[in-house]
Amino acid sequence: MGFRRNFRRVLRKWKVIVYAVSFILLLQAFFTFQSSPNLIEEEHLKRIKELQIRKHQELAQKMLQGERSLVDGKIFLNPHDPGFREQFFKHANDSINILEDHDVGKVAKMEKLPSKLKPHNFEEIQFEAETKIPSIVKYQPKCEITLKDSLSALSRATSDACKQQIADTACKMQDNTLFPESMPRTCPHENKFKFDAPMPATFDPDLRPVRICYMLVVHGRAVRQLRRLLKVIYHRNHYYYIHVDKRSDYLLREIIKETEQYPNIKVAPWRMATIWGGSSLLRTLLRAISDVLKIWKDWDFFINLSALDFPIEKDEKLVQYLTKYRDKNFMKSHGREDDKFIRKQGLNRVFVECDTHMWRLGERTLPKGIIVNGGSDWVALNRRLCDYAVFGNDQLLVQLKHWYEYTLLPAESFFHTLVQNSDMCESFVDNNLRVTNWNRARGCKCQYKHIVDWCGCSPNDFYPADLVRLHTSRPVFFARKFEESINQEVVNHLDFKLHGEYPPGTPGLHSLWENALRVNEKIPPNCDLHVASVLQVEMYKKDEEFSGYVVTFDAGWLKAGESEEVIDGSARVQLQALLSHQPTLRMLDRTSALSKRLESASVGTNWDIKELVLRDWGGLIGPNSDLHLVARWSRSDDDFVVTVVVIDPVNVVADYNDFRTPSKAAGVTETPLSLKKPLRPGRWVVRFYVQRQFTNICAELDFYVTPLEFKDGAEGDSQLREINRGVVDDAQLNAASRNLYSIRTTLNLPHNNLAATELANQAVHVDGAKLRRWVDAVASGAYKAKDACLVAQATETWREAQPRRCYTPRQITPNLCENLNWSSMSPDPKSEMIPVKPDGRIR
């Protein structure tokens, strides 16, 4: 009874709560029942999902089985159904929600595709497990590449287009579809034919003299040497077609100006960036031949020269010789066994040119039925051969052009092989009419390995001691190479020998000027060197004078194709630069007493009153710096009062001061500048007057306030906006609250509203490239990079790091730092730690 009575008492007390809980449970059960799907509907949804998944899997399997081909730059993964890709994309878009459902089967998550997919936006589809997942990759190999050289090339190539070209070529190599197995030969001779063309004892005066079309392939900056070559080979009966390398803008502008007056000299309106050994060299030659065939109708021979060639015989003798053999073609063949030549020349290898590099992809078999011949790419071709090489379309020519598109040094054997296997083989003369100065011990150092996967050779420059090589048993009319910047005497010797010496006293005969820099010259895109990180800054003094800062830094070239400043991690070098402080003191009235006594002046921070020096070495000033004007005076019996006026970047007087020069002694004066902070960034000016004679400015001194890029070591602080703008109110510029009205009225300086607006616009940026450019622009007013050097053991470090797209012929490589006196890498015996000597000392 007691238990029952207690239970009723508790039930009465908690009755309301029990009813409430029961009601909530009933509501929850009701809504759960209402929201649950009908079993039939649930089964129907499940079947729809399974059907869609199965359809997608079948489609994926078809994709895997489909072939891949490249048609008009678009990739179709199943050539049997050109609309298959669009069908796949549409189905994929419709099935996105199902493919992302992790509760259904083993469907992997697929990255959501754009709503409107176009074939050329899609590069590759990859699948994983049973259900393959489409994904975008950088380039699309059409096969599994196994060739070792091709894999190496792919790992080193940078652009997607280049990788695709390498991969496509490698796949064709692997399935033996890149080259024909054989080519036709129409030469009536079984072996190579060579016609002997000696120098005739006499010439027939009744023969029509031949007219020559010279093609000059030039690059670099030696415009004076090119002008000199044109001068000695020029004749009004000949024609001259000049191709200027795409990277030689200065040379192009100069040569266009120089040749305007000559109707028989044309500069090619197109330009290629040719590289040593590249297939682009042959394309350049063939395109030039096509041009000159259309431009001029009456030339007989095509001769290619470079700016480093020079004639060793007069033009009249060359014309007579070619007139005698007007139906011949002059090419120098190799002087060794064919097999050895083919191996050394790399003709049994496949090469592809892209990214300004010749990539070796693997071995190949030479085509059957023809004789492969070659030697030098400097030739003299008659018009008939030129017309055939450009406009012919027979099987031999078409297949040879294709074969040489994948050949190293194609210009050195294309014309040789074409002639030897055509019906013009009897026109082949084994002589290219020139002498080349070979010194293989010095010229074969694999110096082109940074642009070609091969070790090549290059001829040497002629010196006077090499002139004996010009005497040969065969007829020769040109020699190479000559560089006046290396030796001008040998060029003078040949010039004077052919055309006589200039009159005595002619100026400039033994002088040379060669352009090194031209303002506003274009450079290859993304080929500026950018600072990656500053490693060290050292103050440098010479003969007790501050000479600047030596900055050690890592630098690199930007990645190809990047719109932002993204430095390629593999294209870096370590450099040192000497940043020299610009002289900023100008004496405007040299007759004044002030100009006669003032030796130097500077504005800076960290004034050392004990040593009477500014210890910030070079005046590195920011918006929050406390500034001091320090002047050094020579001895004089007279002293006087100096008035200095400080003018800010918007041409507003910010401070003035009076002080007396040292009396009857040399000395230093220091004047604190009372300027309200933050200082306005930009160029400030201090004017020197004698005893407030404001009509006569005796001297001016510039100093620069640099905006801040960091605050408390961090970028992007919003306070930088206010700091870098400086004091906004002109009335608040002076920290000492001096009344500047009188002096401002006296000087009557116009307010620079444009500078004020520019300052406000620049101060908006608290981080990013625009702020950095502003900092650099202001700092460059105070400092200039006087010199730079390479921190390395050898200059090859520069070439190995430099991107191939930035390579330019005859480019300037920085000096090694250890060879420059200003560099901290140069020897310093007085402070070098050495092993202990026998006397126990290291000094």
From Swiss-Prot:
Residues 823-843 are annotated as: Disordered. It holds the Pfam family Xylo_C. Its cofactor is a divalent metal cation. Disulfide bonds join C143-C171, C187-C425, C444-C457, C446-C455, C527-C806, C789-C817. GO terms for biological process: chondroitin sulfate proteoglycan biosynthetic process; heparan sulfate proteoglycan biosynthetic process. Its main location: endoplasmic reticulum. GO terms for cellular component: endoplasmic reticulum membrane; Golgi membrane. InterPro entries: Glyco_trans_14 (IPR003406), XYLT (IPR043538), XylT_C (IPR024448). Glycans are attached at N93, N304, N821. Residues 1-14 are cytoplasmic. PANTHER family: XYLOSYLTRANSFERASE OXT. Catalyzes the first step in biosynthesis of glycosaminoglycan. Transfers D-xylose from UDP-D-xylose to specific serine residues of the core protein. Initial enzyme in the biosynthesis of chondroitin sulfate and dermatan sulfate proteoglycans in fibroblasts and chondrocytes. Belongs to the glycosyltransferase 14 family. XylT subfamily. This is Xylosyltransferase.
